[in-house]
Amino acid sequence: MKFFIGDNLRLAGKTRHGKNRIRENGDLWEVTNLDGQDSSILSTKACVVPIKESRRDEWRWLDLPSDEHMEIVEHIQ
């Protein structure tokens, strides 16, 4: 699955940590930065921020394609 800056993701928590982030910030997040996408050696990471305007300072990095704490439920382009 290919991601682009500006895409929206619906996330769900896998671990207690991930579930707490979803409870605090909501399940809709926006991709603001991508790192390592052009490398065959490095893993790809996506920086995401919550869609909620009041929580825009609560960014986090997601390891793609599988993150330890969160899973991507829906990719909204």
Regions found by a protein language model. Give the residues of each.
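Short coil-to-beta transition motif at edge beta-strands of beta-rich domains
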Residues: 2-18
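Short beta-strand segments and strand-loop junctions that repeat across beta-rich extracellular domains
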Residues: 16, 23, 50-52
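Short beta-strand-centered aromatic/proline hotspots
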Residues: 20-36
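Short, solvent-exposed secondary-structure boundary/capping segments
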Residues: 38-46
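Intrinsically disordered, low-complexity, charged/polar segments
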Residues: 45-77
